[in-house]
Amino acid sequence: MITKNDLNTIFKWAKNTDFPLKKAPTAEGYSNKDIYISWLKGAGKKVFIRKKIMTEEVADIFLKDEIIFATFSTFESGTILNPHRDPDVYPCRYKRIQLPLKIPNRNHCFMIWDGKKVLW
């Protein structure tokens, strides 16, 4: 099970890591600006983890079966993502956890869930 302590460890590590970024492939109309990502974990027939940029403690957390896929993403100021649903790429249901690392203006960085504005 992923614990709050695990999430705090990932958060602290990620805040101090310089991620190698690549432009994310996105569908037409998904976003008004480019999004950049750094792949961290993928799981399918085999599990792949980008250990080169992880501490041993963080790699151990990412090795847990509960984490199926992980990326670091960065959004430019003013990025708008239209409401969307991620495709079902795994055979079982999964939850998505988003850990905002840097929020320049709390009132301008938010998500709308079920018609309600959610601030971090």
Model regions: which residues?
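Non-heme Fe(II)/2-oxoglutarate
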Residues: 1-64
